[in-house]
Amino acid sequence: ILTATAIAISSCQGDLLDTKPYDKASSGSMWSNENFCTMGVASIYATLREGYVAKEAYLMEAFSVGATCRDNDYPLLAGTASIGSGIFSDYWKQHYAGIYRANDAIVHLPDAPISESVKGKLLSEAKVLRAFYYYKLNAVFRGVPYYNTPMELDQADKPRESEENIWNFCIQDLTDAIN
C-alpha cells in the first residue's frame, strides 16, 4: 500500500491544480474578444433588474387606487422609511454595482481586440448606463461620490461631489455616447 501511494503521488502532474475557471470569465480574459466584451456590457444592464432599481415602476403603481404593496415596501410608501430600514443602502449599493460594471467596461474596452464599430457601440452603451445610474443616485441623494474607474477598496471613503458636478458628469457621458 505504501509503495502504491508513493507511486501515485509521484506521478501527479503539477499543473493539475493550476486551472482556469471554465464557468466564468476572469478579469484577465473578460475583455479579450467580442463575445466577452458584449457579455461585459450586458452585465451593466443586468443591474437594472435587481432590487429597488427594478421596482421603481412597481412602487409608483402602489400609490394608485386599489393597489397593494408588500410589507417591506410600506415604510417607503408611508413616508416613514429611515436610514436603518435598508431601503436607501440597497438603492445605493445596487446603483454603484452598475457604475462599477460600467467603469470596468469604459476602462478596458478601448484596448479590447474588437472592431472599432463594435467597440464604439459598447462604449456608448456603457457611458449611457453610467450616466443613468448617476442620474438616479443624484436625484435621490443630491450629490454622491464620483468614480470614473473601477473602485478599489481604498477608495471607498471618497468624498461626495456636489449635485451640480454629478449632473455635469452625466451630461459629459451622454455627450460622449452621442459622439
Where are these regions (language model features)?
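Sec-dependent N-terminal signal peptides
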Residues: 1-5
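Short, surface-exposed recognition loops and adjoining beta-strand edges that mediate ligand/DNA contacts
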Residues: 54-67, 72, 147, 179
